């Protein structure tokens, strides 16, 4: 007779609950939050505020992911990548998934409300409502512009980190919002290309499925080029230094070259889209780290003024 230890019995459901919150997405967002927070802190870090911001926003993101899993259970069942999720297999009762999402949201927003400020709280709420309400409930299923709308919510974490320190929306916060929104587009389109059959099976109108892979290639190149230009605004406006400018130009240029390879006649579409996707993650992680380290202290002239 096979015996199962108590630890094994507990680990399985705990693992299922953890997967519902999409820990990979949480970790990716944490890197962006740290970048925005340290950019604003300019070397004067409030450890308690930073910890509260990271934990609070992580809980908010986890809440959004759990509720997204609850909403998407019907389309997840049609996709090979997602058909084994707990909301599809029944590993966790749907009421518990919804309850978990609500509880995490209450805790996350509570922490942000108590420790941060109104600007950070409002941006977190904006991102949450766009992701759960507008994107998950409607745009993802019904519009080719779902990716564009969803990109706004994906760009919120670094802005929340920044505003947690400054308490206001300023030029740097706007640049971060634009920069991370633009990054989301080629990142998401690349996923949609190498997961084309999944999205097609679930009847999700992402650009490659709705309007063709060739148009998606064009959009990938366009958004990477625009992302590269917007990224230079941080050093040009004096929020970061020459180091960030150099790293931004190198990574963006390499990413753009990689995207242009999609037009080669002998391109392996699956491999190419995975490369564009993989380098997108590396790019945003490197830039988040660089902005955290290459901030400009008060009183230093903007790079644009130095060039002039």
UniProtKB/Swiss-Prot annotation:
Subcellular location(s) of the protein: Cell inner membrane
Reaction catalyzed: heme b + (2E,6E)-farnesyl diphosphate + H2O = Fe(II)-heme o + diphosphate
Domain of life: Bacteria
Main location: membrane
Pathway the protein contributes to: Porphyrin-containing compound metabolism; heme O biosynthesis; heme O from protoheme: step 1/1
A single Gene Ontology CC term: plasma membrane
UniProt entry tagged with the keyword Transmembrane helix: yes
Any Pfam family hit: UbiA
Keyword Cell membrane among record annotations: yes
EC identifiers of the protein: 2.5.1.141
Transmembrane segments: 20-40, 47-67, 92-114, 118-137, 144-164, 174-194, 218-238, 240-260, 275-295
A biological process term (GO) from this entry: heme O biosynthetic process
Membrane topology: Multi-pass membrane protein
InterPro entries: Protohaem_IX_farnesylTrfase, UbiA_prenyltransferase, UbiA_prenylTrfase_CS, UbiA_sf
GO molecular function: protoheme IX farnesyltransferase activity
Leading EC class: transferase
UniProtKB keywords: Cell inner membrane, Cell membrane, Heme biosynthesis, Membrane, Transferase, Transmembrane, Transmembrane helix
Something else known: Carbon 2 of the heme B porphyrin ring is defined according to the Fischer nomenclature.
NCBIfam families, alphabetized: cyoE_ctaB (TIGR01473), PRK04375.1-1 (NF003348)
Family statement: Belongs to the UbiA prenyltransferase family. Protoheme IX farnesyltransferase subfamily.
Function: Converts heme B (protoheme IX) to heme O by substitution of the vinyl group on carbon 2 of heme B porphyrin ring with a hydroxyethyl farnesyl side group.
HAMAP family (alphabetical): CyoE_CtaB
The protein's name: Protoheme IX farnesyltransferase 2
Organism classification: Bacteria, Pseudomonadati, Pseudomonadota, Gammaproteobacteria, Alteromonadales
């Amino acid at each position: 007779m096979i015996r199962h230890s108590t630890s094994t019995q507990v680990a399985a459901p705990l693992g299922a609950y953890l997967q519902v919150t999409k820990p990979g997405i949480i970790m990716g967002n944490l890197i962006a939050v740290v970048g925005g927070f340290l950019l604003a802190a300019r070397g004067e870090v409030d450890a308690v505020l930073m910890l509260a911001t990271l934990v609070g926003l992580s809980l908010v993101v986890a809440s959004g992911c759990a509720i997204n899993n609850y909403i998407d259970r019907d389309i997840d069942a049609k996709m090979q990548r997602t058909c084994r999720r707990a909301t599809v297999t029944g590993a966790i009762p749907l009421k518990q998934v919804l309850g978990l999402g609500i509880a995490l949201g209450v805790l996350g927003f509570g922490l942000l409300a108590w420790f941060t400020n109104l600007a950070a709280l409002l941006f977190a709420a904006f991102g949450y409502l766009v992701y759960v309400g507008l994107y998950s409930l409607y745009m993802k299923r019904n519009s080719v512009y779902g990716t564009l709308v969803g990109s706004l919510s994906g760009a919120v974490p670094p802005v929340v980190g920044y505003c947690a320190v400054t308490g206001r929306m300023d030029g740097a916060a706007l640049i971060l919002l634009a920069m991370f929104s633009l990054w989301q587009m080629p990142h998401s389109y690349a996923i949609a290309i190498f997961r084309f059959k999944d999205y097609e099976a679930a009847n999700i109108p992402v650009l490659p499925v709705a309007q063709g892979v060739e148009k998606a290639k064009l959009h990938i190149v366009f958004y990477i080029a625009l992302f590269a230009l917007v990224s230079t605004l941080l050093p040009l406006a004096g929020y970061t230094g020459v180091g960030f400018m150099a790293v931004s130009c190198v990574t963006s240029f390499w990413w753009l070259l990689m995207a242009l390879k999609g037009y080669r006649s002998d391109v392996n579409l699956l491999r190419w889209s995975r490369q564009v996707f993989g380098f997108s993650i590396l790019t945003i992680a490197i830039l988040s780290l660089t902005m955290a380290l290459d901030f400009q202290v008060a009183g230093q002239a903007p790079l644009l003024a130095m060039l002039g």
